[in-house]
Amino acid sequence: MEQKLGNLVKKNVVNSVFQGRSLLAEKDFTPMELEYLIDFALHLKALKKLGISHRYLEGKNIALLFEKTSTRTRSAFTTASIDLGAHPEFLGSNDIQLGKKESVEDTARVLGSMFDGIEFRGFKQSVVDDLARYSGVPVWNGLTDEWHPTQMLADFMTIKENFGHIKNINLSYMGDGRNNTANSLLITGSMLGANIRIVSPKELQPSEKTTELAKKFAEKSGSRFLITDNIDEGVSKTNVLYTDVWVSMGESDWEDRVKLLKPYQVNMETIRKTSTPDDQLIFMHCLPAFHDINTDYGHEIFEKYGIKEMEVTDEVFRSIYARQFEEAENRMHSIKAIMAATLGNLFIPHV
């Protein structure tokens, strides 16, 4: 009897949709699976607000690997782990030697023997891929130079909260169209049926490889995407104006980037160009944002280039359209959903 029960448990674990899987890029999951995770995140957010316990990771140990510094990702994974009953352990760039003094494979095998799940935030996509390949435990991509999948769950969760649906929503991303956020928005939106516009100068538009992948997903979902340097065309009748920092972590070409992207700043004129009613338009930003000179970076840019605001003006950042802090909070709830689904004591047979 015990043997039969054990076999049944093993069979169920194997057949559970999410159990043991890693989230390395959005394309690792089907559109229906992403929609399920978004709805699960909304459910977990409701439980959190009601003070209802949801400790699906009781007794689990989670390694948080950070080559790149972070406020939101670290805070979200830490609080999500604790709420779920797990113990998070932070390992910063001075604690891990990925590919330097120890190979990624060796590190993965060691961490996999001690931890039940691993989050990685860093530079190379190959590192998070290898952590998943060799650790034997679920691995979650907190950000790489190519993709930002945990951000996407929070972003599209925020969109669904505000509009009640994702399909046919128009989202215009303004800025560096080659960075991880732009890549992930284009792919995720195309998977989920949202119409994504990447509004960037020609020098900073997505790669052909990324657009070809988006095209395949868009054909299946019925969504439409647009890559353009024409701001008027890119923001017309949009529902979501989205932007990101002009220079990503690890980059240093501020002067060229400021010159290229200054026309693509999200300001009140951009809002007017959308011609979208106020109740059908929101602004989003994955943060941090340079909307004033109250930071060292902001002050430095002002001293060098004479601009007090970069990718978004302070007026828009503090306007009725702004949802960036709601979006930031949703990092915790959506990360909680992916951790619980892939590692928790849940059985999800299908979606």
Curated annotation (Swiss-Prot):
PROSITE patterns named in the record: CARBAMOYLTRANSFERASE
Annotated Gene Ontology cellular component terms: cytoplasm
GO MF: amino acid binding; ornithine carbamoyltransferase activity
Annotated binding of carbamoyl phosphate, by residue: 70-73, 97, 121, 148-151, 286-287, 331
Source organism per UniProt: Oenococcus oeni
Catalytic activity: carbamoyl phosphate + L-ornithine = L-citrulline + phosphate + H(+)
EC number(s) reported in the record: 2.1.3.3
Family (UniProt): Belongs to the aspartate/ornithine carbamoyltransferase superfamily. OTCase family.
Record-linked SUPFAM superfamilies: Aspartate/ornithine carbamoyltransferase
Pathway listed: Amino-acid degradation; L-arginine degradation via ADI pathway; carbamoyl phosphate from L-arginine: step 2/2
Annotated NCBIfam families: orni_carb_tr
Keywords assigned: Arginine metabolism, Cytoplasm, Transferase
GO BP terms, alphabetized: arginine biosynthetic process via ornithine; arginine catabolic process to ornithine; citrulline biosynthetic process
Residues annotated as binding L-ornithine: 180, 244, 248-249
The name this protein goes by in its record: Ornithine carbamoyltransferase, catabolic
Its job: Reversibly catalyzes the transfer of the carbamoyl group from carbamoyl phosphate (CP) to the N(epsilon) atom of ornithine (ORN) to produce L-citrulline.
Top-rank lineage group of the source organism: Bacteria
Subcellular location: Cytoplasm
PANTHER family referenced in this protein's UniProt entry, alphabetically: ORNITHINE CARBAMOYLTRANSFERASE, CATABOLIC, ORNITHINE CARBAMOYLTRANSFERASE, MITOCHONDRIAL
